[in-house]
Swiss-Prot record:
Statement: the UniProt record of this protein carries the keyword Nucleotide-binding: yes
Catalyzed reactions per annotation: hydrogencarbonate + L-glutamine + 2 ATP + H2O = carbamoyl phosphate + L-glutamate + 2 ADP + phosphate + 2 H(+)
CDD domains, per the entry: GATase1_CPSase
Positions that bind L-glutamine: S45, G219, G221, L247, Q250, N288, G290, F291
Superkingdom of origin: Archaea
Function: Small subunit of the glutamine-dependent carbamoyl phosphate synthetase (CPSase). CPSase catalyzes the formation of carbamoyl phosphate from the ammonia moiety of glutamine, carbonate, and phosphate donated by ATP, constituting the first step of 2 biosynthetic pathways, one leading to arginine and/or urea and the other to pyrimidine nucleotides. The small subunit (glutamine amidotransferase) binds and cleaves glutamine to supply the large subunit with the substrate ammonia.
Identification of the protein by name: Carbamoyl phosphate synthase small chain
One Gene Ontology term from the biological process aspect of the record: L-arginine biosynthetic process
Organism the protein comes from: Methanocaldococcus jannaschii (strain ATCC 43067 / DSM 2661 / JAL-1 / JCM 10045 / NBRC 100440) (Methanococcus jannaschii)
Length: 354
């Protein structure tokens, strides 16, 4: 099958298609993880994005449902240098997702690094004419920026779900903005009961569950669009312990009156170094975000707890008095290092400060 990747600046790359025969639009981003393509594709934070892997060979070890981070593929499309197994091709076909291979991903990665993420179109078909490519380029240019699309409603649970454990020592209400399953697993493994609720659940409904703490999950898109969620978080501050991961860190910062901004190409990979400003320890972390918190916008009673050692951006915040903290990186990994798994223990300990 033929395949073409069309960028809004007019760049056109032709390659070989795999997966579903269709066309999709989205923001083209890259991730530097060397393994974990199943976890990447099923991560809800990639909704609205076409994901490119910088590692050249994908599919080497097949596909297993145990590796899923949601109920299926959430990325809009997949860009790789070379696919090495039919399992990955079948996986994309099962979830109606197109992929392109046999293109210069190093060129594309450098382009995004230098110019920033771009709107793009990926099409896979038996034949693709020049006229079709010209028409798709015009559609790419008109396509909405990711900041103008409501993505969280597409990946959040529709109904509350209870994840029980045999001997619960804490209860967490998880505001699901597109949660990765390993976040839930990591809490349940620590004997924490998790009540997963839709992203727009009202604060008074959350409190009816009598949580020991509230966790705001990761998810896709621009945090500033989630005004209803931010309002609910504001009403929870000072009432119940709160923590957050990735998008949750941004939403908590906005609830405190801070600001967020879109990064040039974001942090997506499994080797991002962060520094704990309290202990001065450095951890290698898994990350997947295209927005960040503006440090100087945070109020005096909120301090930065972690920074990224590559670009000095905010990687976590902590309230100076209240039992509230959040991190921009992913302590649950999947894929990536487990260096900061201890933060789930810190989350559960928040109940002792109620």
């Amino acid at each position: 099958m033929e395949a073409v990747l069309i960028l809004e600046d007019g760049t056109i790359l032709k390659g070989k298609g795999f997966g579903a025969e269709k066309e999709v639009f989205g923001e083209l981003v890259f991730t530097t993880v060397m393994t974990g393509y199943v976890e990447v594709l099923t991560d809800p934070s990639y909704k609205g994005q076409i994901v490119m892997m910088t590692y050249p060979l994908e599919g080497n070890y097949g596909v297993k449902k145990d590796w899923f981070e949601s109920d299926g593929i959430k990325a809009e499309g997949f860009v790789v240098r070379e696919v090495t197994s039919k399992a990955l091709d079948d996986f994309l076909k099962e979830y109606d997702i197109p992929g392109i291979q046999d293109i210069d991903t190093r060129f594309l990665t450098r382009k995004i690094r230098d110019k920033g993420v771009v709107k793009s179109c990926l099409k896979v078909a038996e034949e693709i004419s020049d006229d079709e490519i010209s028409e798709l380029l015009e559609r790419v240019k008109r396509y909405s920026d990711i900041s103008d699309i409501d993505l969280v409603p597409l990946v959040s649970t529709k109904e509350p779900k209870i994840h029980k454990t045999a001997n619960p020592k804490a209860r967490c209400v998880l505001i699901d903005c597109g949660v990765k399953l390993n976040i839930i697993r990591s809490l349940v493994q620590r004997n924490c009961e998790v009540i997963q609720v839709p992203y727009n659940t009202k604060y008074d409904e959350i409190l009816e569950y009598k949580p020991d703490f509230v966790l705001i999950s990761n998810g896709p898109g621009d945090p500033a669009r989630l005004k209803e969620v931010i309002k609910n978080i504001k009403n929870l501050i000072g009432v119940v312990p709160i923590t957050g991961i990735c998008l949750g860190n941004q939403l908590l910062s906005l609830a405190f009156g801070g600001e967020t901004y879109k990064m040039k190409f974001g942090h997506r990979g499994g080797n991002q170094p962060v520094k704990d400003l309290k202990t001065q320890k450095v951890y290698i972390t898994s990350q997947n975000h295209g927005f960040a918190v503006r440090k100087e916008s945070l109020p005096d009673d909120v301090e930065v707890s972690f920074i990224n050692l590559n670009d000095m951006t905010v990687e976590g915040i902590r309230h100076k008095d209240l039992p509230i903290f959040s991190v921009q990186f992913h302590p649950e990994a999947r894929p990536g290092p487990h260096d900061t798994m201890f933060l789930f223990d810190e989350m559960i300990k928040l109940k002792d400060r109620k």
